[in-house]
UniProtKB/Swiss-Prot annotation:
Name of the featured protein: NADH-ubiquinone oxidoreductase chain 4L
Stretches that traverse the bilayer: 1-21, 25-45, 56-76
Similarity comment: family membership: Belongs to the complex I subunit 4L family.
Catalysed reactions, as listed in the record: a ubiquinone + NADH + 5 H(+)(in) = a ubiquinol + NAD(+) + 4 H(+)(out)
Entry's EC annotation: 7.1.1.2
Gene Ontology MF terms: NADH dehydrogenase (ubiquinone) activity
EC top class named in words: translocase
Source species of the chain: Albinaria caerulea (Land snail)
Membrane topology field: Multi-pass membrane protein
Gene3D superfamilies, per the entry: 1.10.287.3510
Subcellular location: Mitochondrion membrane
Length: 99
């Protein structure tokens, strides 16, 4: 098996894990970050075969860092508002009946 096969298998496992996480937002964010890093590593492996593409790798790394910072800031704001990182608290906010 090549490295692409391993990365594809790992990506599928993380994709299934993403949809089975229902209790904690923090674990959901960790799985989402690992999916992003798997995608980044597969792009890095594919760009390794091309010459002169180091700028694309730096750009992708910047996007991954910005995505991680955004998700962490959203999680911190959510925990400050609800004092909990449980998915049940998010469901109460999103699906609350307005009178």
């Amino acid at each position: 098996m090549t490295i692409y096969s391993y990365l594809l298998l790992l990506c599928m496992v993380m994709f299934v894990t993403f949809f089975t996480q229902k209790n904690n937002i923090l674990s959901l964010m960790v799985v989402l970050e690992s999916l992003m890093l798997i995608t980044l590593s597969s792009v890095a492996v594919s760009l390794n075969y091309m010459a002169g593409s180091s700028m694309v790798m730096i750009l992708l790394l910047c996007f991954a860092a910005a995505e991680a910072a955004l998700s962490l800031s959203l999680l911190v704001c959510f925990i400050q508002v609800n004092s909990s990182c449980e998915m049940l608290a998010m469901n109460k906010i999103l699906f609350a009946k307005k009178s």
